[in-house]
Amino acid sequence: MMLNTLFLPIFLFFLITFDYVSTQTCFNGYFKPNGTYDLNRRRILSSLASKVTAHNGFYSSTIGQNPNQMFIISMCIPGTKPERCSDCIKGSTDGLLRSCPNQTVGYVWPDCCMVRYSNISFSGSLIMEPSQPVSDPAPIGVDLTLFDRIWDELMSRTITTASRTHGSLSFGHKYYAADVASLTTFQTIYTMVQCTPDVSSGDCEFCLKRTVLDYKKCCRGHIGGAFVRPFCFIRWDLYPFAGAFENITLPSPPPPLSLTPPVSN
């Protein structure tokens, strides 16, 4: 396992709406505007949406030669419709161009797609930083002991499913899972986790488990949230999102609390 932690200037840009979480993260040096690296970046980002959809939702490539070589990986979550995948990638690349005007490394991981580029090859590297939690600060409004038990079990189950190596699936469909659990009679927890497919199963599991722990340190008890890292991502909420739950059967609501009748003398 190769673990890299980057202590570099980081520029984070966040956008949160009711059903969308987007984070553009830019770091690790600068390039000259209108120089060769800039032209390479614009060239590959401009056509990325069509290439991802044409390659079954996953695409990786390089462009140029050192010192202006660029490495890129992009994907949509399994099952995303081509039009939605293309729109997500296009919005992501536009956001990177705006938010990272001359940074040599950047990534963005909205709900149903991700884009990551660098001037250094990162395939298979366990790069954990920069990372960022995003959450709704409103309190969950239920008993935290009950919530923690259900949420922890759901996250553990989802991570186990995602981190298994799915040899029968295409490369871009590895390391992904979405699942649900009943919280109350009227509330359901929705979770989605994903890693990029270039890392090992063990590294994927490590990243997701570490991300869950870090998320709980900052955001325990909040209504919904996400935690983004360069090669793994978690999100949960109390409503379905990203089209990830269309084929998942909702669980039965928990049984009502039973009341023990009084004992008569």
UniProtKB/Swiss-Prot annotation:
It comes from Arabidopsis thaliana. It is found in: Secreted. PANTHER family: CYSTEINE-RICH RECEPTOR-LIKE PROTEIN KINASE 11, CYSTEINE-RICH REPEAT SECRETORY PROTEIN. Transmembrane segments: none annotated. Residues 24-122, 128-241 form the Gnk2-homologous domain. Glycans are attached at residues 34, 102, 119, 247. Residues 1-23 form the signal peptide. Belongs to the protein kinase superfamily. Ser/Thr protein kinase family. CRK subfamily. This is Putative cysteine-rich receptor-like protein kinase At4g11521.
